[in-house]
Swiss-Prot record:
pH dependence: Optimum pH is 6.5 for catalase activity. Active from pH 4.5 to 8.5.
Covalent cross-link Tryptophyl-tyrosyl-methioninium (Trp-Tyr) (with M-248), where: 94-222
Intrachain S-S bonds: none
Organism of origin: Synechococcus elongatus (strain ATCC 33912 / PCC 7942 / FACHB-805) (Anacystis nidulans R2)
Active site as annotated: 95
Descriptive protein name: Catalase-peroxidase
Taxonomic classification: Bacteria, Bacillati, Cyanobacteriota, Cyanophyceae, Synechococcales
Superkingdom of origin: Bacteria
Site (described: Transition state stabilizer): 91
Amino acid sequence: MTATQGKCPVMHGGATTVNISTAEWWPKALNLDILSQHDRKTNPMGPDFNYQEEVKKLDVAALKQDLQALMTDSQDWWPADWGHYGGLMIRLTWHAAGTYRIADGRGGAGTGNQRFAPLNSWPDNTNLDKARRLLWPIKQKYGNKLSWADLIAYAGTIAYESMGLKTFGFAFGREDIWHPEKDIYWGPEKEWVPPSTNPNSRYTGDRELENPLAAVTMGLIYVNPEGVDGNPDPLKTAHDVRVTFARMAMNDEETVALTAGGHTVGKCHGNGNAALLGPEPEGADVEDQGLGWINKTQSGIGRNAVTSGLEGAWTPHPTQWDNGYFRMLLNYDWELKKSPAGAWQWEPINPREEDLPVDVEDPSIRRNLVMTDADMAMKMDPEYRKISERFYQDPAYFADVFARAWFKLTHRDMGPKARYIGPDVPQEDLIWQDPIPAGNRNYDVQAVKDRIAASGLSISELVSTAWDSARTYRNSDKRGGANGARIRLAPQKDWEGNEPDRLAKVLAVLEGIAAATGASVADVIVLAGNVGVEQAARAAGVEIVLPFAPGRGDATAEQTDTESFAVLEPIHDGYRNWLKQDYAATPEELLLDRTQLLGLTAPEMTVLIGGLRVLGTNHGGTKHGVFTDREGVLTNDFFVNLTDMNYLWKPAGKNLYEICDRKTNQVKWTATRVDLVFGSNSILRAYSELYAQDDNKEKFVRDFVAAWTKVMNADRFDLD
């Protein structure tokens, strides 16, 4: 036998399996991976593909017709309940959109992420892999003109229409990602659906849910249908429902409407032994081809399917939109029972036979009704009960509130209406869309810049104000940004991070310039920052004119939901070297989070930090990280001095360091962890050394300008 016989020709571990990573060797090292996800190396479409343009070619009428036909085209390999896939498709859409949380804007239906781990294998998403496979022929037919994200969101909407609901509308424009997100924190738990009393719980104190999470445990979309930690108690469950839905930007009325509307159709599946289900998709064998939860010992389909473990329908007619949910919930008394799969569920006492839904396969058989603990909360919680009673008495009002809430659920993470595409986009402006009126594009931009330059405002004031206006942008749900100039409105004008006194002084000047020139305040704020950068670059010997596109509008107080905007408050900003208070996460980790939400890369983050420091934009005017004797000049001094071995770095307090001359021990500068990480982290140091090079002084300026412009234009969807 030769030396190579019987041995794998591939070196084990390094490239094809999960090996010990750098992060595991050095768990305290800063992980920059969240800044390099979704790049072109994983995207097979190529740099010239533009989904927003491609989807405009979609034959929406034909697609709608195909989806309508699919709803009643039952397949033997996964039969439709009562011959209609509506309930399954609604659950598919709901569980895609329902991962959204308002705190950081992450999650939601906007990326098609349900195709990938962990979502494709969450316990709460059991058997949704079958729904996506049922949709595959439609995706295959319409190809690049229809993303998975749009199709998944649209399927539930058409399902409702096919069952009799007049929907509020629909917008296309969601672009697919091609691998799981690395930036979404789903929770601290290390197992699926553990009790909240376990170690690594997301709850503290009096059932206080960790931010930014909007689900009660790992693997569930919202709440446990059996009750808190699987223990039925509708009033306790009502608390969980209220918290999780509020964190998804839904009020009590929307919560009741979505709960009732979601359970007006379809059924729960638990007529079998859940222990007989095979592994989830990510753990399934290769021959299962990405399908999970397969029952290989029994049929496991149709009336014998097991999903949540609860068993039964909520209404007598589960394939049609009606008011049966409230009629059943409010008119019957309910008692706790166990499903065939052993799950807690509520069943009616002495139901009338005509109220019992028929079997999914045999219409001559009647099955019992069921309510989850969350459904019972709609009856037992006093506020939810009032809303339920109103909906019961006014079915038309219920249908309208639900249709609007469903539209909000499926579009909350799409951003402003400028991103909406398709023939069914509603004309009505909705407050949660953060509407912005169109701005003036026809004014003398240079005249505005000249007035700004002559205003007497400092470079620091100009740049800081523009940055503060733009930094609220979140690429996760496309909210925030400089467009709208909401920095001049409540609540933003009073945020500590925006230095209200300085902001008021600068805005008073810039608003006057806007009024005199016909430009929007939003445009003038951005132009002010550009003027400051151009002046600083000129002082450094680089003549450059920053790109600028007029047309931002000015939002009004009436167009601004102050409560909704509160979540955009910057409680930390490493770019301005500021923390509102101490946090469990390190300052540099918080910087990465803001950078990722801004849609920036690690090199862009690096060059922006270096530039903003020497421009003197620190919050409160602190000098931490201002490694230059030429403040206000756009030099690469931050990087030159950071990488200079003539200096020694010493701790001088919590998140504070002194930079001392090695020979004299004289303190030269002070710094924070955010400053020093650009010299301590090996990747960031590589970028810092690049910008510290003698031949890259002009490159530094031009790269800073490019990154700055990217932030200023991040929310300009009208330019796409």
